[in-house]
Amino acid sequence: MILFTALLPPQDVVAALESELARQGVDPALRWSPPSNWHVTLGYYGDVPEIPELALSGRPAPSLRIEGAGTFPGVLWLNIAGEGLAELASAAGAGADGRKYRSHLTLARYAKEDPDAGKAWAERLMAFRTEPWVAREAVLMRSDRDERGTSYRVVERYPLNG
């Protein structure tokens, strides 16, 4: 089973983002993630046979906000900024593989051969900002793939202090 820990944006942040995307007009050239899949990954564990032991409950709750956008090859994302996020991600295992942690919310995917598709959208969304919110819990999520695409479901919840 493929597992990762994440923070889920609250409904008012989801609504603000949905409104912004509706205002911008969604580009069919991109494969947009449904709002039900929006999350901020903390730690990625990959295909593991059992649920890992995680010491996340009771950790300080980070204060977050969306500000700006960017791309990885084939991925359009929104930047997640805030106090306490890097520390929580580190506790969840981010960076254990030697890669630098980059807090983000994946919005869409596109053909890596067409980097301009993502770059244009990143520029359009660069000024998008949300009000800050406090993440009251981290979640362990399972990723499942079928003919309809990828879906995520919460396996465990870790309440945060704050």
Tell me what each language-model feature is:
Residues 1-162:
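Histidine-dependent nucleotide/RNA phosphoesterase domain, centered on the 2H-phosphoesterase fold
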